[in-house]
A protein has these predicted regions:
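Flavin-dependent oxidoreductases
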Residues: 1-113, 127, 131-135, 219-221
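C-terminal catalytic lobe of FAD-dependent flavoproteins
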Residues: 92, 96-103, 113-221
Length: 221
């Protein structure tokens, strides 16, 4: 839309690597059909979102090895979905971003709805994290769920001006972390440069001013 390059040159230790400017990842999310109150805290109020990174073997209820390496889940009680809702690690959509159909989005798309593999591994992850979820895999919802997200070359957000007069907030699927960004961007639009946004300029790729590489299985960590 902004006629930006298909690829971006990234300077790493004196060498330039070309990566897609945008890369879609498929988001794997679903719901365990239990009363949302099943996961409230001891005071009966909403707990924070539980976000787990792990590298231990993950088994299902029958003892079958599902994952032998890095994995991660996140979950929370959700009264909108009517259960415990959350997700597993996303996976790369292995085709150019221009060839990805973003409409219809999410559950309405036959390309990006989760399947039985997700339900099995997410239920196993829940049981691994908290004993109350043991034996609950059969309660996984089969309602269509899932979606896609657009990521930057290094999976960190880009906040910058393009084409002289277009300000872009590309969150790279960092979600709730963007809550405070709007106020900072508003100040920049009024002419007050924000130091907190400087590490997230698009120019960082060409300059080699990159962020640390995370060991998390999630691209947004």
């Amino acid at each position: 839309m902004l006629d930006l390059p298909e690829t971006t040159g990234i300077l790493v230790e004196g060498e330039v690597f070309e990566l897609p400017t945008w890369q879609f990842w498929a988001l794997q999310e679903g719901t365990l059909d239990v009363d949302p109150g099943y996961l409230m805290n001891n005071e009966g109020t909403m707990p924070p979102v539980v976000h787990v990174d792990a590298d231990v073997p993950l088994y299902d209820e029958e003892g079958t090895l599902l994952v032998d390496g890095k994995w991660g889940i996140y979950y929370k009680p959700d009264f909108n979905f009517g259960g415990v809702q959350g997700g597993y690690m996303p996976y790369r959509v292995d085709r150019p971003w221009r060839d990805v159909a973003i409409d219809p989005y999410g559950p309405a798309s036959p390309d990006f709805a989760v399947g039985k593999d997700f339900r099995a591994v997410w239920a196993a992850g829940l049981a691994h994290c908290q004993g109350r979820f043991e034996g609950k895999a059969g309660l996984m919802s089969h309602a269509p769920s899932g979606g896609i997200g657009a990521f930057t070359p290094d999976n960190f957000p880009v906040f910058d001006t393009f084409c002289e007069n277009v300000y872009v907030i590309a969150d790279s699927n960092h979600g709730f972390k963007m809550i405070g960004v709007g106020a900072l961007v508003a100040k920049e639009l009024l002419g007050e440069t924000q130091a907190l946004l400087e590490p997230f300029r698009y120019s960082r790729y060409a300059e080699g001013q990159l962020h640390p590489v995370s060991n998390s299985p999630y691209p947004w960590s």
